[in-house]
Amino acid sequence: MAAKQLQFDEEARRSLERGVDTLADTVKVTLGPKGRYVVLDKKWGAPTITNDGVTVAKEVDLTDPYENLGAQLAKEVATKTNDVAGDGTTTATVLAQALVHEGLRAVASGANPVGLKRGIEKAVDAVVEELRSISRAIDTTSDMASVATISSRDETIGALIAEAFDKVGKDGVITVDESQTFGTELDFTEGMQFDKGYLSPYMVTDQDRMEAVIEDPYILIHSGKISSMNDLLPLLEKVIAAHGSLFIVAEDVDGEALSTLVVNKIRGTFSSVAVKAPAFGDRRKAMLQDIATLTGGQVVAPEVGLKLDQVGLEVLGRAKKVVVTKDNTTIVDGAGDKADVEGRVIQLRAEYDNSDSEWDREKLQERIAKLAGGVCVIRVGAATEVELNEKKHRIEDAVSATRAAIEEGIVAGGGSALIHAAHVLDGDLHLEGDEKAGVQIVAKAVREPLRWIAENGGEPGYVIVSKVAEMEPGHGYNGKTGQYVDLIADGVIDPLKVTRSALANAASIASLLLTTETLVVDKPEEDNEDK
């Protein structure tokens, strides 16, 4: 086991703070409509230019091992916020930095970190509850366009994303792809997505995006587990003879069968991707039938008289393309008969109407959306690969932000919602001592996102924060125009989910950092010089 080196007490916390500062200072220049870009060096190919907080954060690793621990904690804030809400990563990082600064100042003054942590948690709960109360549901396509425009910094992209959600609905699937032209356009295709990823990373075809993409595959839908290669081999030979590729949906694919698929993929002999079937029990059977209907195939199962080692190509479904990530599968343009798909949707709607269970109705609604909603592909074009990647980052963030807004509603944007929601902390939540100090830490920290939106636009941040704090909720500073306006009427809105996730995740990591007393890292190996 490698030797370790340690840091303790104040020295340890200051190292963590320096690491958080380094990462946050790198990320926060991107905040707001006038935020700047960060250029990321790549070992191969052109550099990446982006204003996406989590993309920048993932690239930061520091040489000092203690400071690097702080940077990695701050990175976790951005990553977690991106996973939950898909946007707001820069805001989350700025909030984490502010909470750490104010918290460590309080600890240095003699406050107990555990008491501060409790106060911070209670304050965040109160602010999130207030955010929920001042939020409103998204009502119109123009609201969706406003959210997407704020996130992408582009009105044309905002309108395109709003149109995409209009087509597929809130449960529909929207993906971002490359275009062969310079423009950005919308392509609506019927399709289905479910939350199961590839069974082996060796199946990946696009290493940059960690996706397995197969064109025009045969689709095997199997109700059981596939372990033996002897069962799969007869069908595999028929697919290879037809010069096709194979996509497998089954309860599981493991053992000899999985190994053979992977080896053939690595050798370039035969292209295949396997995923586990979505859901469990009766709902899994129903969803396999949905996939079969969409792709024009049949579910291979003993109860319907179909055995894997005896079936031919006629029971396999087809699709134009299947895209599989580590978490999700998207089937695009299934070859099933439209009348059969419509009949299946009508059947599901009847089940929905007759169901008394809220949970069953919710799951049926999801299945209807997956069958009827389809897939919208936003095709992105640009003059160079660098510009293309930057544009794709912005559009992917904007799609996530719009979906978050549809799910939980919107609040006034530009950092003002946090400031106005924090008025609930004016009485310190009737807490005392260190918990009261924790509340005051949150009250100060929530001002930082607006401050940096203003600073990045060349305006005095503290002055603007003070003015906005005195305005009524819903009003604030428009960083793009430099005016004080009714933000919602002006289309400056943020998804509630993004705002609350940013605050909650920042507070979670900052609280842990404040209560840290010891750092343990690997001792660097000393170079042995020849004497």
From Swiss-Prot:
Intracellular or extracellular location(s): Cytoplasm
A GO CC annotation given for this chain: cytoplasm
Presence of the UniProt keyword Chaperone in the record: yes
Superkingdom per UniProt: Bacteria
Catalytic activity reported: ATP + H2O + a folded polypeptide = ADP + phosphate + an unfolded polypeptide
Keyword terms of this UniProt record: ATP-binding, Chaperone, Cytoplasm, Isomerase, Nucleotide-binding
Annotated Gene3D superfamilies: GroEL (3.50.7.10), GroEL-like equatorial domain (1.10.560.10), TCP-1-like chaperonin intermediate domain (3.30.260.10)
GO term, biological process aspect, one: protein refolding
Enzyme class: isomerase
Presence of keyword ATP-binding: yes
Molecular function per GO: ATP binding; ATP-dependent protein folding chaperone; isomerase activity; unfolded protein binding
Principal place of residence: cytoplasm
CDD domains cross-referenced by the UniProt entry: GroEL
EC assignment: 5.6.1.7
Cleavable signal peptide: none
Binding-site list for ATP: T30, L31, G32, P33, D87, G88, T89, T90, T91, G414, D494
The family this protein is said to belong to: Belongs to the chaperonin (HSP60) family.
Subunit structure: Forms a cylinder of 14 subunits composed of two heptameric rings stacked back-to-back. Interacts with the co-chaperonin GroES.
Function: Together with its co-chaperonin GroES, plays an essential role in assisting protein folding. The GroEL-GroES system forms a nano-cage that allows encapsulation of the non-native substrate proteins and provides a physical environment optimized to promote and accelerate protein folding.
Protein name (database record): Chaperonin GroEL 2
Upper taxonomic lineage: Bacteria, Bacillati, Actinomycetota, Actinomycetes, Propionibacteriales
Name of the gene encoding the protein in the UniProt record: groEL2
